[in-house]
Design a protein with these regions (language model features):
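ATP-dependent adenylation/pyrophosphate-handling site
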Residues: 1-21
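Metal-dependent de-N-acetylase/amidase catalytic core
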Residues: 23, 37, 42-43, 52-197
Length: 197
């Protein structure tokens, strides 16, 4: 079973009136619920922290929110953001996940992976190789690419027109590029942070 946690509201960093902000947050959450249902996931959790402003929230609070959800659902595998995404919220969520999953004797989290986020992961321009997203795990998604595109269409407010990185064409192109790295049509790439066997 898969459970997603949305820590930030995803909207409050965009200037708008309170009524419109509330409506947009509710729409975003409705879309996420629809995606979860279509994908066979458990109902997602929404924490509604301020968007693109997690650096204004005490770090301990973020880590404790994540730790509470981990203790509640007891996942063996966690997927989180890449530590060097351009988005400050992604950076802090990564650090909070690492903090919340520190390897204590009774931990049940055996695998932690970082995923790439179009329009955030690739926008962190740096010459330092150790700061780039260099995947070491690839999953063949050739059989699921059309389903992924259908599900992504539910997130109407997040998708953009080509050539934006969050356009359907760009997302499919990224999957094709990752697939070409392992000799398949389409793939998704990850960084292994922890894998206990």
């Amino acid at each position: 079973q898969i459970k997603t946690i949305f820590l930030a509201d995803g909207e409050s960093s965009r200037s708008m009136k309170i009524k419109k902000l509330k409506k947009n947050i509710e729409l975003r959450e409705k879309q996420a619920l629809k995606v979860a249902k279509k994908s066979g996931f458990l109902e997602p959790v929404f924490k509604r922290l301020p968007d693109n402003s997690l650096d204004t929230v005490p770090f301990l609070k973020i880590a404790q929110l994540i730790e509470k959800e981990i203790n509640k659902y007891k996942p063996t595998t966690i997927f989180t953001h890449f530590e060097n995404d351009l988005n400050i919220d992604h950076q802090l969520v990564y650090k909070a996940v690492i903090t919340a999953t520190r390897p204590l004797s009774k931990t049940f989290v055996k695998q932690i992976y970082c995923f790439e986020t179009p329009s955030s992961t690739e926008f962190n321009f740096t010459k330092r190789q150790n700061k780039l997203f260099n995947p070491n795990l690839f999953l063949d998604v050739s059989k699921f690419i059309d389903k992924k595109k259908r599900i992504l269409k539910v997130y109407k407010n997040e998708l953009r027109k080509w050539p934006h990185a969050r356009s359907l064409k760009s997302i499919k192109n990224l999957a094709a590029f990752r697939g070409s790295q392992i000799g398949v049509k389409f793939a998704e790439a990850f960084i292994v942070l922890r894998e206990v066997r």
